[in-house]
Amino acid sequence: HPAALPGSSQACPEDVGILALEVYFPAQYVEQAELERYDGVEAGKYTRGLGQQQMGFCAAHEDINSLCLTVVQRLVERGRLSWDAIGRLEVGTETVIDKSKAVKTVLMELFRDSGNSDVEGIDTTNACYGGTASLFNAAAWVESSAWDGRYAVVVCGDIAVYATGNARPTGGAGAIAMLVGPNAPLVLERGLRGTHMEHAYDFYKPDLASEYPVVDGPLSIQCYLRALDRCYAVYRRKAESQRQQGERCRRGPFTLDDFKFLIFHTPFCKLVQKSVGRLLLNDFLAAPNPDTSGGLYKGLQPFRGVKLEDTYTSKEVEKAFQAASQEIFNQKTKPSLLLSSRNGNMYTPSMYGCLASLLAQCSAQDLAGSRIGAFSYGSGLAARGRSSPLDKLLSSLADLPARLDARKRVAPQDFAEIMKRREETHHLANHTPHGSHTDLFPGTWYLERVDDKYRRQYARNSGGAKMPFSQLLTAAPSPGESLGGQFLMDKSGEATREGSALLGALPGPWGPWPDRTSVRHQRLQRPLHPEQTVLGAMGQSLEGQRLRGRD
């Protein structure tokens, strides 16, 4: 089949979404229970109260650039990509170390030896929304007339640190890179996306000389839950509208029963558990005649007349619906909290860390034929996956629990000292980071030095040995060795026979890739295969699609 060319009005790529997903988190952590004792707070305040077990944090040698360099390099290496197979690179982050120079420009150093500077995209910054906005931008590019047949890469990365006090245990750090293109195992659905935006001073960073945010905790939680309410309402309305237009629609309101799994942006795990209860409250109030004498809504009759806007601070409502939704939480959400509970809040990558955690612990059979709801505070996405290519994506994340176990535990007093030193050296010129980079994971990029003009120099360690840019990039696979066999095209845009053959034969951690030489897509809603997963997202933006069997 002909490959899609820019400006083609006859076809657009089919099943655009996430082809591969790579996760990076720091190599050291602090135990939350030990941090409770060190901070002199009551036992369980961080562990039971917040639902957090451990918190990852960055060493002095790591910054937002090094995190993103590491995760992009790892995505390319494990996927056997060539650097010239990437035509767009988007970065979502709120960790700003330069008011003008984007993180994306630093990442372009990885492309240098390939000669590929024709890479669109830039940084997107708006608290935790930037990652999902970047994903939508990348997908829109692939689906647009500007697409030139290459992949897009989306990077979400942040370092979440707080001043000493109650907020510090809700920190974390990490980065996630996603490969975006056609025929993906996780597909961004068309037709279901709801958005909620508003102005609020709940969380912001007005002091550019500090990494620490200004936070109004109670207001921030209220904003989070209000966004969840409004986006779920928009999502439900659009989903029900699609049902009515479908030929074989399932009658009745859209409810949590329509999701097999639910994943959320996770500032701390306890808020996610409350959010599941919040969604159940929405279903309860929207139900025409809920049965309160038994079943899911048993005993909830006293709350039948409440208004959502009056319940954000009601502990009675929160407790009742959290208890009623406990089994839903255990089945649909708890498996996704592995990374959040053990590494903490990563900001822009947070919800994608939950997606990675879910994929790392579920089989393709668990996910096939189901819908996954995803709430990203600030936005959302939807996806589906055929069971075969989904297997390959799952296998690439199978080592996530082992990687968490391989980290180094740091005593709370040492953690506090590292945070103090980080505060003192933040944005310091003519500076060499304290300590050794050899404690980082092998293959991690690190900050080597900041010169007197604030220019940052990076290197990559491999088993403790420093590797400069030039040595690292000479071994990059050629286009013919990458998984992007579709890029082996003749001048007419037809995929060459050799290029087509590569598509199903390339080795790698994800195994052979599906055929990408056919990219024709009808924009009308199509029947889906019974063994496909739908991931519908809820947030300040929401996307999803009805799942139905093949005609």
Predicted regions and their residues:
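Intrinsic-disorder-associated, low-complexity terminal segments enriched in Asp/Asn/His/Tyr and depleted
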Residues: 490, 515, 521, 529-531, ...
